[in-house]
Amino acid sequence: MIKSEEASDRSVMTMDQLGGYYHDPRAHPPFSHPHAHSHPHQHTHTGHPYRAGNLLTGGNYQAMGGGESPTELIDEKPNIGYMELKHYMDATPTATPVSAAQHYSLSALHSMGTPPASSSPIPPYGVLMTAHSAGSASPQSNSKTPTDLPQDLQYASSSTSTAKVQPLQVQLQPLNHQYASTIKYCSNNTILSANDYQLLTSQEQAGQQQPQQLPAQQLQHSPGGGYMSRISTSPSQVISNAHGMPVLNYSSSSSSPAKSLNGSESSPPSQNHLENKVSGSAVVGTGGSSQQDAPSTPDTTKKSGTRRPEKPALSYINMIGHAIKESPTGKLTLSEIYAYLQKSYEFFRGPYVGWKNSVRHNLSLNECFKKLPKGMGVGKPGKGNYWTIDENSAHLFEDEGSLRRRPRGYRSKIKVKPYAGHANGYYASGYGDAGMDNGNYYASPAFASYDYSAAGATGVSPAGGQGFADPWNAHAAHSGSSSVGVGMGVGPLPQYTNISCLAAGGNVNGSATTPPLAHSALGMAPSASSSSSPLGAAATLQSDYAPTASLVAAGYSYATSAGSLDNGLRSISLQQLPGLSSIQHAQAQAQAQAHHHHHQHHASHPSHSHQGHGSMHQNHGTSSTTPPPSQSGGSHGIDHSPIDRKPAYLPPISPPPMMVALNGGGGYYEGLKYAN
């Protein structure tokens, strides 16, 4: 005989092909079942511990089916030993090895017992010790075990604790062997995890297969009449196996009734089998004596299959008001109001009575309803109260629509953004955002959210990592993370984090033929262009905006040097500029038409470079005063692009005059603003 562990490897194969293991009773002396059952118990519990990894290997241990043939699981060492579960399966060559990968059927699970270290990626622990459990489950444990099976059932040992429980017809379904094991022991109710899952899924399969296999399978699976659980009362309940985790398939009491669900799902025959499995899991905990068949049946009590009538469109206040107004006396008792509502609306006629609470709630909390004590009758004062409409509120009930109940979710539906402008982030945040106190009025919320000064200090804006996640950075998507790359040195431009990149970007355009949109990828290496050193510093400014800046710079012919500008312009194609704002597109178009204005712009934009970068900008662009591209004569295409004229505060940069900022941030500011 071979210890279950090794068996698991072969077993898994064996099981599948043989359709079940033949468990030699001799192998498990404890198992009394002689396999006298109509179909020999092919104890799927091969005793091979769950494959080393507790994998439910694809082995499909199918006890089902019946491989009446004695399948031998050949496992060298039954780690099952945890449970005393060392079952040695007769290694019968008959079993044809099934690929280990094949699913371990549930039965395999129980047999998983302790997984040898070998095959399974998953550690041995949590192995289902049930190897003998199939056989081992004591008849008693399965209350339903057929009498013929019980003798077999005696859980042999017990430590195995009916791990046998699942003959695992379920095994049919390929369980993720790796995951199954993992699942198994991940949950202390392990079975629930892998086994349950298998059971459930396999049950469905089994449910179809079982009816045929079931007779044999049940018997073979469980001495207890094919009850999967076949769970012996043995405390070990396989689950105890390595972890003491209730990994055991359904063996452990921990196995939750959910498993039993499986049973219930399976076809009636399989149901027994499954129930036992399930109950086994439940039972195991209880020594198997208390099989929980009930849990095995899914709870369907709440599902009547019919929906309640639609709730009236009127509010409770309105309906109560109608009732009172239509009464001859103008007042009604609570019970009369109930009667009116039931008569008038189908919704109130069903079994649901929660609406009565709503009626009482509305009567007592709304000032429009007034409570009148019942007058003195012949004898004592009347019991209860009348409800009437307060004269001061009568007008509320004259307009039918005023109290009409709005459909659920109505308010949320009307809470839509007033205009899409915000989406673009152009003006969304309002110029006075707290985030913009440094004078960067890029209305977009994106800017508002950044701490520019902090960003400047680091040379990377806080959002740098985000790389233009902001609404205004449409091209952010292109940029990847902040491509701050533009050769960005660490020149922090505290307030123009977004802009600093532009300067670098300008370099990129000038020096690199790379399309501006490549900016993110570029990392602006091109920033090395003639002005690159200063630009690099600028680029360093706000790494987070680098991509945008680079795009803008690239997209615009803002390259610091005119020559580089032209190159950059050429490199840029409109297709490449989609990420750029319309301005950028316009510029791109204009580029072909008028690079000159771009040069001007670039000059201006360089001027915008942050403090200390001004020098670099100065190179080309003392012309920073040049109007932003939108204004430049050559930039006819640019005109249409929206430009936020709001002045942006530029730290005193020697080259850039404030006017540039006013103009739109010297072109590249604009680009940034409208990047999206």
From Swiss-Prot:
Annotated DNA-binding residue span(s): 311-408
Biased composition (Basic residues): 34-48, 594-611
UniProtKB keywords: Developmental protein, DNA-binding, Nucleus, Transcription, Transcription regulation
Composition-biased stretches (Polar residues): 133-160, 257-273
SMART domains: FH
Annotated Basic and acidic residues bias: 637-647
Location of the protein in the cell: Nucleus
Positions of region (Disordered): 22-50, 131-160, 203-232, 249-312, 583-651
Protein name (Swiss-Prot/TrEMBL): Forkhead box protein biniou
Source organism: Drosophila melanogaster (Fruit fly)
